């Protein structure tokens, strides 16, 4: 090449230049039967191509590879230049075109597109044959769902003409008057169609579809400064008008609190976005990760018009989007790393809501299918719908809604264990028992549990997340112990093991709880069965037939202290047999029950309100007043919503309660019956500190429900005492662990065996229904020693 020959500096090409070239050659590219799509991006270099050692070798390598370039065998490098990406069904070398070749020369994709003013735009040909997508008829959750708050990543369900359609709630937006969940239009239906979602307890009705929806817009209307004469920006975005905004958080489940909008427009949109990491949470796939592979992907042409998606996103291995993820928001990971060798954990990453996933493109290469996500700019969506992103709705709620109490009590208890070997063993396996306290206190929390499904679940939540489930069906779990399904969730023998309504008045004692503490003969299965029969007779005499049936129902007769007794016996046996996996599994699950015992509402007939009196509440959907029991809804508001919302303030108070010397400061016990009595003692203490009726009164006085004002009011009234009862729960749990360890002669187990355990070995134990089996009160006696 001489100084007089034309030389093109492709690195100076702008997004505008690339779009102008594609627009100019619109019909030319459209005529290529082999071309299935185009986009703009950076030139892809085959991964085994030698890196350039001299100037110019990047564009013209001395030993250039000629085999098919695909999305998986090529990459963007720091010297990649701007280009138009042309995706073709099949690959053919240049010699296959022409008189002696197999193909018409007119069908060859040009290497360069030349504009009238002398600019030249390179074309990068990529083999990426389109394939049909996988679909699923009904929604199936990817893992454990939130117990309480809905938010980004929650499923959106609509039923139209006998068919069910699912999508994902991407984020919350507001028009200044109402708040909406943004999702895919196809899961909204016509205006005012009722929309549903799912929590752990089952399906919930959340609102109605809005008439404000998007389908497609002319490219020139969305991007007036960019060329695109015969193109549509494809959109599939709808809004769900929420019945009760306080049921929602602006955060995405399992991700850090939502950051500021990743605002994209003609003036700042550049190819620097290529290869940038993004992540989101789909209702079907759970946590997904990817990278932005191309911009303005033309995926279809009809009647001479192109249909274009703003972003083509390549999935990370094993983390692709699927049917039901439409509506999900992709978050741009804009984190600045302080130490590249130790990247910041997910809760501390800087994520910016960037794009709404509305569709997918499946490419097939050598029989392997890869699902790419097509997404549109969230800033454009907000502009076209005339709404703004909501970032401050229940910001403190993110990650593990409903788990905070159980996990934190287990984490606090480990430090209180006196036996050095046992404490070290539990500390080494804290990730199996629970999470460390700093992680639990993070507003974003880590992603692990939210992605679990039928994989490993930290033990402190196994009784809720595994055993209180069916072992089959849509919301089933392997290892589930429930036996029947109903309109409000499933039921089975595990459920009554979590509580004991023993503050009913009986005999000379004010409560049956007091009678158990005063006389050990009341700590028998027969005495408890007689108590429930007495309560049933009393309810019937008062005209409360529902109450009478409840007290006689074997699945409603709470037996929490006997469940702790059963676990003490099991842990002792595991220690005696030197079965460290069995002991660890039982110890972690037992943390859940001692956590339940430390919550006053788990030991009271007022567990979710006082049925003997009613209050008038305004129904958010019907707009009408209704009569409900006094305190109805208090259980989840106090134990789930308030504790999760106030975790950052609660944990320092608990640490202060536990700051003195002496560990758990409780005597070690040597029998299951003594441990059952200690559990009743704990329930009595926490009821004295935080009387159940006081919780109900605070809830009603604060306005009921789970609005921020209600949670703030309850925290002001109950916060200090909540810390005190949770600290007691941690003390009694540490005492339970150490008592079983010492009584079973844990000192005989070689220290070399007290190592890090494999979570899958632990899971293999708890999915067995015979592992510390879940039994009703009338059946558990045979298990107790």
Curated annotation (Swiss-Prot):
Its EC number is 3.4.21.-. Keywords: Antiviral defense, Hydrolase, Protease, Serine protease. The keyword Protease applies. Residues 470-481, 491-501 have a biased composition (Basic and acidic residues). Residues 470-503, 608-629 are annotated as: Disordered. InterPro entries: Peptidase_S1_PA, PLipase_C/P1_nuclease_dom_sf. It is an enzyme of class 3 (hydrolase). Transmembrane segments: none annotated. Disulfide bonds: none annotated. GO terms for biological process: defense response to virus; proteolysis. The keyword Secreted does not apply. It comes from the Bacteria. Signal peptide: none annotated. GO terms for molecular function: hydrolase activity, acting on ester bonds; serine-type peptidase activity. Probably a dedicated protease for substrate gasdermin bGSDM; cleaves the bGSDM precursor, releasing the pore-forming moiety, which integrates into the membrane and triggers cell death. Involved in defense against bacteriophages. Expression of gasdermin bGSDM and this neighboring protease is toxic in E.coli on solid medium. Belongs to the peptidase S1 family. This is Probable serine protease Ga0098714_109514. It comes from Bradyrhizobium tropiciagri. The lineage of its organism: Bacteria, Pseudomonadati, Pseudomonadota, Alphaproteobacteria, Hyphomicrobiales.
